[in-house]
Amino acid sequence: VYAISVALIGPLMRIITLKVHAHRLLPILVAIFIISNIVGMLAPNFNVLLLSRLMSATMHAPFFGVCMSVAATVASPAKKTQAIALVQAGLTIAVMLGVPFGSFLGGFANWRVVFGFMIVLAIITMLGMIKFVPNVSLSAEANISKELTVFKNPHILIVIAIIVFGYSGVFTTYTFMEPMIRDFSPFKIVGLTVCLFMFGLGGVIGNLITGNVPENKLTKNLYLTFLLLFLTIVLFVTVIQNSILALTICFLFGFGTFGTTPLLNSKIILSAKEAPLLASTLAASIFNVANFLGAIIGSILLSVGLPYIQITMISGGIIVLGMFLNLVNQLYEKKHVTFNEYS
């Protein structure tokens, strides 16, 4: 529910707020997140808890989209892809620390404590946004009709297809990562936490490495990260039965997962020069479409009785489709795209 809400509401929320300056909009979006988590922490029933997640979903895509736009705007032309990747690195570090800690905390304390912890962190974030976000003019010449042309750009549509049809394979496996580790590895709660930490650590390193890839080499490097994802996913169930190999493959899975996202984010944002504001939010939204589809595909496969090892094989097949679409993208770029002089 959260992922599809982000995908559907995110672009609409960004269109509504196009004229709001980034240094004002970002604290407002974080405030929405704080309120949603207060509602979640105090929720008397599941319906109210679900409502809190929907509230939180309204700010997800615009928040990361605006952050990436600000980073790309203040960076020099030669450093734009690196700036976008650094924003993604913040998210990756949050995953590295937050997911295992949340899992650990949830195993020993009331789930409402987790919401309270997120509220405290969000308040600190909001204060930081108010203090440090520069007053850059992202929205001075914002034009809704011009921004909507992003949906007519063939290059962007191809990249969107790569994310939707390729990256959903990643989420098909990622959805069941924790239960697979519990069922097939020798680890218990602490070991599971370490595995999730290794996934996040791999994500941070992968993000930082691919964040330095210049614009004209993004497409070629996508083949490498997709290949790494394919291999780690199809071997995941077999490899995690050994403690050392389990930690290694969790690291590689994180490396491939978060090493791919800055490449795709940069491709969408840098390809949408006619619609920079909506494109950055669209990138965050499309990843959540892939998240939603991957979870649905995985759930359907599990419900019909397929074992985890077959689900990971199907995930690998979906990633191969993403690699094929990347080939289509490469052929399109050879004919129609001229990369800037700084690449």
Q: Predicted segments — roles?
A:
Residues S36-V39, N47-S56, I244-L252:
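Paired small-residue
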Residues L270-L306, S315:
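A late C-terminal transmembrane helix in Major Facilitator Superfamily
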Residues K220-L264:
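C-terminal transmembrane helical hairpin of 12-TM major facilitator-type secondary transporters
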Residues S52-G90:
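Cytoplasmic helix-loop-helix junction between adjacent transmembrane helices
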Residues V48, P77-A78, Q82-K131, F176, ...:
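Helix-loop-helix hairpin linking two adjacent transmembrane segments in secondary transporters
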Residues F63-A75, G259-A272:
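Intracellular juxtamembrane helix-capping segments at the cytosolic ends
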Residues L8-P44:
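Conserved MFS/SLC helix-loop-helix module at the cytosolic interface between two early adjacent transmembrane helices
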Residues I9-H21, G206-L218, L302-S303:
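Helix-to-loop junctions at the C-terminal end of transmembrane segments
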